[in-house]
């Protein structure tokens, strides 16, 4: 078994799917760790091509020899809720002013998408987490 590579950094970014480029925030974050920025951008864009239009969080693990691996996460719940509700952004005063409504079916669908990243045992618990996010954004769940 080959020796394990030593991890020197963990970078978390949220980038538009298929649109990573060396400009900030990607370039500076990777540059500090000496990662080949273009190599990452090409790999990320290829991996997220099918999900264009979504913001996809990524965790990049940087090793001592400047190589890297990355793990893609599911899109943020807030972005999925905004898309489902059809509004550009959440409420400035979430508990006073409501900006939109989503159905429990939509919340369940988002929970299905996010299940692997959520700390929930079943789909009902995951749906409650998503409903809480909706509430804090001024979106009513019916």
Swiss-Prot record:
SMART domains: RL11. Transmembrane segments: none annotated. One of its GO terms (biological process) is translation. GO terms for cellular component: cytosolic large ribosomal subunit. Forms part of the ribosomal stalk which helps the ribosome interact with GTP-bound translation factors. PANTHER family: 60S RIBOSOMAL PROTEIN L12, LARGE RIBOSOMAL SUBUNIT PROTEIN UL11M. This is Large ribosomal subunit protein uL11. The gene is rplK.
């Amino acid at each position: 078994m080959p020796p394990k590579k030593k991890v020197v950094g963990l970078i978390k970014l949220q980038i538009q799917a298929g649109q990573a480029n060396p400009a900030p925030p990607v370039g500076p974050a990777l540059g500090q760790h000496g990662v080949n920025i273009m190599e990452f951008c090409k790999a990320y864009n290829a991996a997220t091509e099918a999900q264009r239009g979504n913001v996809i969080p990524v965790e990049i693990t940087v090793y001592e020899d400047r190589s890297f691996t990355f793990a893609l996460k599911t899109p943020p719940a807030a972005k999925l809720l905004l898309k489902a509700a059809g509004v550009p952004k959440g409420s400035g005063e979430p508990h006073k002013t409501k900006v939109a409504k989503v159905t429990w079916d939509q919340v369940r669908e988002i929970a299905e998408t996010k299940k692997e990243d959520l700390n929930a045992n079943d789909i009902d618990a995951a749906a409650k987490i998503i409903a809480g996010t909706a509430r804090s954004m001024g979106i009513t769940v019916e």
